[in-house]
Amino acid sequence: MVKESAEILSEIRKNYILTTMKGGKRIDGRLPDEFREITIIENYVPRANGSAYVALGKTRVVAGVKIEAGEPFPDTPDQGVLTTNVELLPIAFPSFEAGPPNDLAIEVSRVVDRGIRESKMISPDKLVIEQGKKVWIVFLDINVLDYDGNLIDACTIAAVSALRNAIVPASREGGEDFKLPVVNTPISVTMVKIGDTLVCDPSLEEDQICGGRITVTTTEDGHIRAMQKGEIGVFTLDDVKKAIKMSLKVGKNIREKYFR
C-alpha cells in the first residue's frame, strides 16, 4: 500500500523478507495467517456517541461516531443514513499531508463502508424518526494516528468497535436514548502476496514489496460481504480461494477473541 510514497526497501532487505518467507515464517516471526497484537479501547472519546481506539501492531487509529437527526435519501425514505470518512493525519506517516483525502484515504473509506453496509451491520429501518422526513444519520469518522501497514483492517476493527458501543441520542427528539441497533460483526482480513505465499495483516515492509493485495470482509454466518483487490499484481483462482478460506478462519478468530 502507498508504495509510491513509502520508504523504498533496499534489495538486500527485500531478498531477506522473501527468503524468510520461503521458510514458512515472516520477518517478525508470525505465521502467514497470523495477525499482529490487537488492542481495543472502547469509548475512547467521551464526548462522541460511540468511539474506539485500535492498535494493530504499530498501526494506530481512532474511530468516532456522531449521530444526528436529518433528512433521509430520496430513494430510501424508510432508512437511516451511514457516512464513513477516513483521515490520514500528517503525524501518522512522512508522506501523509493535510488537505483533501488522497487515493489511499478514499480507498480505505470505501472498503470499510462497504463491509459495514453490505453486511447490514446496522438495522437502517430502526433509525427512522418520521418516515420520509426525518431519520438518524450516523457519521463514522476514523483518524489514522500511526501507520505501519494494514490500514483497512485496523480501520474496520475500530469502526465496528465504535458502532457496537454507540448510543443514539433520541432524547434530543423527545424519545429515550438507545443503543445503535447492531445486527452482526463484519471483519475484514487483508492479505498480500509475498512471492507465492499469501499472508494476512501485512506490515509496512510487507506492503511495500507485495505482489498484490486482496481484502475479504465476512460475517459470523460465514457469508462474504465485500472484496477488494489493490496494488499491482495477479491473483490466480486458487489464490482467491485461499484468501477466502483464510479470511473466514481469521475473521472468526478475531470475533471470538475481541467481540464476544
From Swiss-Prot:
Cystine residue pairs: none
GO BP terms: rRNA catabolic process
CDD domains in UniProt: RNase_PH_archRRP42
Record keyword Lyase present: no
Cellular compartment(s): Cytoplasm
GO CC, one annotated term: cytoplasmic exosome (RNase complex)
Alphabetical list of Pfam families matching this protein: RNase_PH, RNase_PH_C
Example GO molecular function: mRNA 3'-UTR AU-rich region binding
Principal subcellular localisation of the protein: cytoplasm
Keyword list, A-Z: Cytoplasm, Exosome
InterPro entries, sorted: ExoRNase_PH_dom1, ExoRNase_PH_dom2, ExoRNase_PH_dom2_sf, Exosome_comp_Rrp42_subfam, PNPase/RNase_PH_dom_sf, Ribosomal_Su5_D2-typ_SF, Rrp42_archaea
Function noted in UniProt: Non-catalytic component of the exosome, which is a complex involved in RNA degradation. Contributes to the structuring of the Rrp41 active site.
Family label: Belongs to the RNase PH family. Rrp42 subfamily.
NCBIfam families the record matches: PRK04282.1-1
Quaternary context: Component of the archaeal exosome complex. Forms a hexameric ring-like arrangement composed of 3 Rrp41-Rrp42 heterodimers. The hexameric ring associates with a trimer of Rrp4 and/or Csl4 subunits.
Protein name as it appears in the record: Exosome complex component Rrp42
Organism annotation: Thermoplasma volcanium (strain ATCC 51530 / DSM 4299 / JCM 9571 / NBRC 15438 / GSS1)
Lineage per the UniProt record: Archaea, Methanobacteriati, Thermoplasmatota, Thermoplasmata, Thermoplasmatales
